[in-house]
Amino acid sequence: MVNPEENNRNLVVKPITEILQDDDKRSRKFGVEMKRQNRRALGVINHNLVGAKAYPCVVNKRRGLSQRKQESCDKKKLDSLHPSISRSQEETKKLKPSGNEFGDCIFIDEEEEKNEEVTLDQPMPMSLEEPYIEFDPMEEEVEMEDMEEEQEEPVLDIDEYDANNSLAAVEYVQDLYDFYRKTERFSCVPLDYMAQQFDISDKMRAILIDWLIEVHDKFELMNETLFLTVNLIDRFLSKQAVARKKLQLVGLVALLLACKYEEVSVPIVEDLVVISDKAYTRTDVLEMEKIMLSTLQFNMSLPTQYPFLKRFLKAAQSDKKLEILASFLIELALVDYEMVRYPPSLLAATAVYTAQCTIHGFSEWNSTCEFHCHYSENQLLECCRRMVRLHQKAGTDKLTGVHRKYSSSKFGYIATKYEAAHFLVSDSH
């Protein structure tokens, strides 16, 4: 006896007419018969045919039967196939006609219908309920790729481990940074504010900031102090014209005000006079302090790049190397006048993104970073390319204060350990 499952594996799908013709020949040739218990209604079989459409007709295979006899027996045979269906149910279950006339019809042998038996040696025809469908591995790969694209990467709760830390202010941290984003526009200055300065230029500003970064490092001040110092300088210069000989004094007073706002231990005025090589007196410092506070309307509490940088590094799950490298890159941006066009949050996000690319050699800007930073990777690319160019010339430029600072053991020689992410600049072509 032939195993039906083995036949089904190697069986070539034949048209339904050939299968039934073979069935007819075998049933006439052999006398041994068996009952078919799994006969299905015409409508059920018709629905499971591959490419077939339902058509309510039955074609007699006997060659001598005329067309008129065939049409007259249609209704009888349909009724015999559905003996338990009432007339009302029959009306509700009318079959849908096919688009062609006889190409999709089901052929039924009258001898089969009378005897309903086949020989034991006859192999069972392939089941019509599960039609053969050719497997296409390429189609499955495409479907798997589409499914991977549709699956979004989960956003991590970066404050989960600080839930029991009262100093982390987990309950308010999201509200705090929402407020910072709303008010950071007041920290920004016009890109062309140097045009109203008659005696100073953007290069002089760069020299001043580079020198103040060294002073900040010598005094071992907090990072917040440095970013607030630069912010006070830019905001003041955007509103007040300053003579060249007073520019260094503006920088010293901005540092003094930032220390008073951020530091616990503040440098005394005499220390600032000394580091200026006594170019200014104590009276000059105090007088400029009054002018600067009056010009800025005593508004000192504005978000800078640093609080955003801390938050975004946390979202990136950074290690010490990433933190130091991101700080190095964002301090390079402080010196460059062209970077004042970008808001503090964008500069901070770009520093983290560029540091990731520099260390790993590829982008790691995931959904968690994008959610907490509110910037997509495409929004960072323009600023990122500028930052990479600053990194490329950091050690060879005229102003190397930031590079020298981060080339020390205190910062793990980070400035000399990693080359700039050149591939980010080359991708811009």
From Swiss-Prot:
SMART domains per UniProt: CYCLIN, Cyclin_C
CDD domains for the chain: CYCLIN_AtCycB-like_rpt1, CYCLIN_AtCycB-like_rpt2
Gene3D superfamilies: Cyclin-like
Record's compositionally biased regions (Basic and acidic residues): 68-80
InterPro entries recorded: Cyclin, Cyclin-like_dom, Cyclin-like_sf, Cyclin_A/B-like, Cyclin_C-dom, Cyclin_N, Cyclins_cyclin-box
Region (Disordered): 66-98
Secretion signal span: none
Keywords assigned by UniProt, alphabetized: Cell cycle, Cell division, Cyclin
Tissue-wise expression: Expressed in roots.
Organism domain of life: Eukaryota
One GO term (biological process): cell division
One Gene Ontology term of the molecular function aspect: cyclin-dependent protein serine/threonine kinase regulator activity
Any single Pfam family the record assigns to this protein: Cyclin_C
Family recorded in the similarity comment: Belongs to the cyclin family. Cyclin AB subfamily.
Subunit and interaction comment: Interacts with CDC20-1 and CDC20-2.
Name of protein: Cyclin-B2-2
